[in-house]
Amino acid sequence: MRKALIASLAVAAALIVAATATGGSTAPAAVAGIPGCEKEKLGLLDSGSATLTIGADNPAFPPWFGGAEKTKPWKVSDPYSGKGYEAAVAYAVAKQLGFSKAQVKWTVTPFNNSFRPGKKPFDFYITQVSYNPQRAKAVDFSKGYYFVNQSIVGRKGKPIASVRSINGLKKYRLGAQVGTTSYDYIVKQIKPDSSPKVYDTNDAAVQALKNGQIDGLVVDQPTAFYVTAVQVPDGKVVGQFGAVGSKERFGLVLQKGSKLTACANKAIDRLWANGTIRNLQRIWLARATGAPVLK
């Protein structure tokens, strides 16, 4: 998710205390790297200093990112901390490619800009970007580092909170962030009676839910649990939606035709094979489960 209120930060911190205690906050030291993926062959944005530049949206919200605000201009969380699922995955990929933590630089890139055509200010980007063929015309995607269901958030005590089917959602006012698979799911699968509301950011969509401008907000499942735990005090995860067709996946976003893409895929393959990704999911995303499936 993308601005939580300052008063809510203590709650957000509580969500990641257990993960920090289990050691999930550490960013790995550099290793030898992958044969054929030497730094000089990767076409890095900052090749002169052998720095890996990683893009992310700002604010950086849990459970995807963690750590207290420390490095400017990052808000809510700090990717440099290595805490949170996506920060941890990013540093794990960097490690596989032979980069130390000191050789990683984070840069702010708005979500919608990450997959637009044009020159990218990063070597790869990581902020819950789902692969789809249309986006892949403009950018490269890595293999999946997370396979995700969409979920819907309502408010406790409201009629939508008791809905138990997709068909039951049709009469409600639904909303999502522009350009997201969440919005696509509303349009293509739920097909509500009234046109869904679209917002430039998830923050704006959350505010609309709090203000009663929409009845339900569609987001990915881990984000739904963050919304209800931190941003909307009376929020409720009404349910999650099963996969339609192939399973939705989050992938790293890279410049179209990037020399880094094949090596990023090899790194992710290694992280699945050696159990790193599943362990990071256990540490950072274990709380984001349990919502009923709406059919």
Predicted regions and their residues:
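C-terminal region of N-terminal signal peptides and the immediate post-cleavage residues
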Residues: L5, I16-I34
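Extracytoplasmic small-molecule ligand-binding "clamshell" domains
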Residues: A32-I126
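A structural signal for short loop-to-beta-strand junctions that line the ligand-binding cleft
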Residues: K41-G43, K75-V76, Q128, A136-V148, ...
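Bilobed "Venus flytrap"/periplasmic-binding protein-like clamshell domains
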Residues: I54, P59, P79-L97, V129-P133, ...
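Acidic, polar ligand-binding/catalytic clefts
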Residues: A102-G168
